[in-house]
Regions:
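Short, flexible loop/turn elements at secondary-structure junctions
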Residues: 31-35, 46, 89-94, 161, ...
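Loop/turn elements at helix/coil->beta-strand transitions in domains of secreted/extracellular proteins
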Residues: 82-83, 150-155, 230-237, 330-335, ...
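Active-site cleft segment of glycoside hydrolase catalytic domains centered on the general acid/base Glu
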Residues: 304-312, 339-358
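Substrate-binding/active-site clefts of carbohydrate-active enzymes
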Residues: 90-153, 160-329, 357, 363, ...
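Carbohydrate-interacting/catalytic domains
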Residues: 1-89, 95, 101-103, 125, ...
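Conserved alpha/beta catalytic core and glycan-binding cleft of carbohydrate-active enzymes
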Residues: 248-253, 322, 329-331, 354, ...
């Protein structure tokens, strides 16, 4: 290389060579930043050849979409960079306190009585939202040793606030943890009699969810959960549902639960004089009392859309909620934001809200993370003044799923043209990762499965369908655990925060929701998969380059990808053979900073018949390693100094 330029704002700045090591020259340029975002790329000149280096790598043409980005003043929490997260759907994780279980006929939800499931191992019903298995926060406390032993660094809870469903994305009261997963100290009243569908007569439920003794005891228990997690070095993220609430919500009160409860104002459904009337958009101003003409999210009357533009008081209150839970005595470490791009009635207001949300949260807890659910281009929200990062569907879950299984993430489609398609894999990764600045990418939530999609292990069977068409047993048939382990290796060696959906590590299967919300199989875990997760998480922790190192694509072929994770302290090469036959590959490891001669050692290899943590050593010759890989295998090689 003759010269290297930093190109920024249309100006070229000559860079200075500051170091040479292992056949690499290192160039630097120091520039003073103001408060404006900086986009840049590098121009590399050698002889008469000029190349452009941007987020795509070395290319011939400039494309500003792939420029590197620096956002002055923007940082994401160091604790979240590369952290191993664990998602808990509380009702299905562990029942530690049967006294708080939802009771059959306690109330009605979507027209039918709720049901307490007595058999922990039963498949979820097709209409699962009103079925309760009894998992709770005491169960999480009881399993803290398990989570710590697994290597979990962050617990992400699906919603925990008062709500009539098991998923709790229809929040009833943002100020309190649901006593059904918290603590019930007052348990007065009766169940609904047979044939009764009106929840204003559900006196047992009303006492459980409106009695301040229950609500405060539940909040206290949650504070204990967070404190215990912190004591063990783990963080906690809450799920925030702020685009909509539930029709049971005390602000709306369509079920008339709060209408006569002590200490509560009338809901907006009940009375035109409700202090919450402007929290919602009502289409018929003459329909009170019991006005059912409110705007629901995507038309769902169980999910009233919150009308922030119509009520500054509502916005102030939700920002108060956002601050409350990341502050003492709860001290939560961040928010995952449900359908965050849908909030408000315009994009302009949406951005305004999240800017104010960020200010509020970071003021209360500067090291709290703000992580949004989003599909599609995230760039507009990741400019340093709104979200920290996103659930990484486009630049992780989807490309990994297509490459390893050929399946769409709901198991709704099979694409043979994408199965094993390394070019498509890297194209998707490059394109979608370009939406991130480095601080956002390092904390992106990288999932293989979650509560909205089929379990990854089920996708390995290539069955297109859902539980209502194929039945739940089909989700377990023809699965390929070796392919699943390939996915785990990618997840645990990719840039970002690998996030395990509870039970994946134990071999739980399931089509898309509700079947993906099966219970954790305590006492019936797949011990090999569980041990594999523990071992690879330990490797990630012991080898810093796997957690926060740079990532570089290496050799690729049909059904084969390889890439490096590296920094000045260590270099690892990750090789994935998704073929059903062995292959031999030559890997140019010098590109990740190894010497031209030396050795690389297998520190993990997964195969059809299991896995091992130690394997052969391979000679580096002229910067390359020649390696034989078994079928359906994943290998991590690490450079070892002699």
């Amino acid at each position: 290389v003759d010269r290297v330029f930093l190109v920024c704002g249309g100006q070229k700045h000559l860079m200075v060579r500051v170091e040479s090591k292992n056949d690499f020259d290192y160039y630097a340029y120091v520039m003073r930043l103001d408060d404006q975002k900086v986009s840049y790329y590098f121009e590399v000149q050698t002889g008469r050849i000029t190349g452009i280096f941007d987020m795509r790598g070395l290319v011939q043409e400039v494309n500003e979409y792939y420029d590197f980005i620096i956002i002055p003043g923007f940082h994401t929490p160091d604790w979240a960079k590369g952290a191993v997260m664990y998602q808990i759907y509380t009702d299905r994780f562990c029942n530690g306190d049967s006294s708080n279980d939802v009771l059959t006929n306690e109330y009605c939800y979507i027209g039918e009585p709720v049901h307490r499931v007595e058999d922990w191992g039963r498949y979820p019903a097709q209409m699962d939202v009103r079925e309760f298995y009894g998992g709770d926060l005491q169960g999480v406390l009881d399993k803290m040793d398990y989570l710590q032993d697994l290597g979990v660094e962050v617990i992400y809870f699906n919603p925990l606030f008062v709500s009539p469903s098991n998923h709790k994305y229809d929040i009833q009261d943002y100020d309190y943890i649901d006593p059904h997963i918290g603590k019930i100290v007052s348990d007065e009243g009766d169940l609904l009699p047979d044939g009764q569908r009106e929840n204003r007569f559900a006196s047992r439920y009303i006492d459980r969810v409106t009695n301040k003794a229950n609500l405060e005891a539940s909040n206290e228990l949650f504070a204990q959960v967070v404190a215990e997690a912190h004591r063990r070095g783990m963080r906690v993220i809450l799920d925030g549902v702020f685009n909509h609430c539930g029709s049971f919500n005390k602000w709306m009160d369509r079920e008339r639960i709060y209408e006569n409860a002590e200490g509560y104002d009338k809901g907006a459904y009940v009375s035109a004089d409700s202090p919450y009337r402007n929290y919602f958009d009502f289409h018929n101003q003459a329909a009170w009392p019991y006005n059912n003409s409110y705007d629901g999210w995507w038309g769902h009357d169980t999910l009233p859309k919150l009308n922030y533009e119509g009520s500054q008081e509502l916005m102030d209150y939700v920002l108060h909620v956002a601050k409350k839970w990341v502050s003492p005595p709860y001290n939560v470490d961040g928010w995952r934001l449900d359908v965050a791009a849908d909030l408000g009635h315009s994009q302009e207001f949406n951005h305004h809200f999240w800017q104010e949300f960020r200010k509020a949260v970071k003021e209360a807890n500067p090291e709290a993370i703000i992580l949004a659910e989003h599909y599609g281009n995230t760039r507009d929200w990741l400019q340093g003044n709104e979200w920290d990062t996103v659930m990484n569907y486009d630049a992780f879950m989807e490309p990994v799923t297509w490459f390893l299984t050929g399946m769409e993430k709901h198991s709704d489609d099979y694409r043979e043209d994408l199965l094993g398609n390394a070019e498509s894999f890297w194209g998707a990764m490059r394109h979608h990762t370009s939406s991130f600045s480095m601080p956002s990418w390092q904390v992106a939530m990288n999932e293989l499965s979650n509560h909205d999609h089929s379990r990854f292990l089920t996708r390995t069977n290539h069955k297109v369908g859902r539980t209502n068409t194929l039945g739940p047993q089909a989700a377990e048939q023809g699965i390929n655990k070796a392919v699943f382990r390939e996915g785990i290796v990618i997840q645990m060696t990719w840039t970002g925060a690998p996030t395990i959906y509870y039970g994946d590590e134990a071999g739980v299967c399931g089509f898309t929701d509700p079947d993906n919300r099966r219970t954790y199989p305590w006492g019936h875990e797949d011990q090999v998969l569980l041990a594999f997760h523990k071992d690879i998480i330990r490797l990630r922790r012991e080898n810093e380059e796997l957690r926060i190192g740079s990532l570089k694509m290496l050799e690729n072929d049909y059904n084969f990808i390889s890439y490096g994770r590296f920094n000045r302290k260590g270099q690892c090469a990750i090789l994935i053979n998704n073929n059903n036959h062995p292959i031999t590959k030559e890997i140019h490891v010098w590109e990740i900073g190894t010497p031209k001669t030396g050795k690389m050692k297998v520190i993990l290899q997964s195969r059809d018949d299991g896995y091992c943590m130690e394997g052969a050593e391979y000679e580096i010759r002229a910067g390359k390693v020649l390696i034989e890989m078994p079928q359906t295998s994943a290998t991590i090689l690490k450079y070892v100094e002699e």
